[in-house]
Amino acid sequence: MNVAIVGAGAAGLMAASFIKNEYEIHIFDHNEKIGKKLFITGKGRCNITNSCEVQDLIENINTNKYFCYSPFYDFTNEQVINFFNSNGLKTKIERGNRVFPKSDKSSDVIKVFEKILKNKNVNLHLNEQVNKIYKSDTFYLTTSINKYSFDKVIIACGGKSYPNTGSNGSLYNQITRLGHTINEMKPGLSAIILKENVEELEGVSLKNIGLKCYINNKMIFNEIGEMIFTRKGISGPLVLTLSSILSKKNGDIKISIDLKPGLTDQKLDDRILRDFSDNQNKTIENAISKITIKKLILPILKSANINPNKKVNEITKFERDNLRKIIKSFDLTYVSNEKLDYAIISVGGVDVNEIDPSTMESKIVKDLYFCGEVIDVDGFTGGFNLQFAFSTGYLAGINI
């Protein structure tokens, strides 16, 4: 029995780890090394999973969460952690139940797989792109170098995000030729581009702020956390999560930042009055310097229609109310998610209705399997997407 795995990313590598040792395994990847995207995940630290309850893993899937019951319960986050621990990788749990290598090095995760592949005598075909897959009595693969035949094939070629890591969607036309449906690919876990010019705020980081989002005046998101301004918009943990939700939404989208989520309107007004009382002869720009960070003061005052050079003792109650409202609701206009090339993951992929969730085998083509980001499932930030890659890779591997 010989097996081809197309893609040496998280899902493909996990699949190879669990295929029977007596099978002949071939992994194809057009990169020069395995785990290229894995290497950069979690800013090079590799957030391998999340240690929450399994049901919470499922709740942190944005698209087609029902498909994840079998994968997540058959190969749980605890089993993922045990897999790496038993293969010599020590792990640690950080804020938000995020699991990382104790070394903080994604390269150590890749070393685990390198060792496994070596012990299993896996045939690695690096710098070799699969151009064509078709099936008659068996599977035939045409690559940039050669032609091969295989009994079974696992497609783990990834999505369309970060194309320079290899997940560029180049195999998708072959997947459709095999009879499968590819749902539209969109950016997920990405920065958000705004209508407003925020270039002067680039690099400004905000912690413990509230982020709300409204579609046609209906609130669809309300979370507290961190974000950062970019040259064209906003990014950071809260924004990444919101971007995935917005990837499949339409309508009039407004985003609002609550700079003081811990204060009620009344308590914030009391705080402003106290600062005004202490700084009556100063300009409003200087008087509110303790309420928010320096770079946000002028944009806040502009939104509140207050002259920054106006003395505090000249500020009217109407202006003070405006100031309070802007601090509690600094409004921004959504334009789009950042381009797919710059997204952490892609939304879309092979339709889950065409895949058996308990085995990852195609319902259309016998002996064809899918795992990882190529499937139309995407999760929020926090280790959930890698858990999906590992769980589906495991199922594909053990069911070969």
Model regions and ranges:
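An anion/pyrophosphate-binding glycine-rich loop and adjacent beta-alpha core
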Residues: E32-I34, I40, I48, V54-Q55, ...
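Glycine-rich FAD pyrophosphate-binding loop
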Residues: K20-K43
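A glycine-rich dinucleotide-binding beta-alpha-beta segment and adjacent secondary-structure elements
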Residues: L126, L298-D378
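Glycine-rich loop(s) and the adjacent beta-strand/alpha-helix scaffold that form part
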Residues: K152-V198
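A conserved short coil-to-beta-strand element within the FAD-binding core of flavoproteins
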Residues: L126-T138
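N-terminal Rossmann-like FAD-binding beta1-loop-alpha1 element of flavoenzymes
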Residues: N2-I27, A396-I400
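Glycine-rich active-site loop/strand segments that organize a redox cofactor
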Residues: K43-I93
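Short hydrophobic core segments
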Residues: A4-V6, F28, V130, Y148-N164, ...
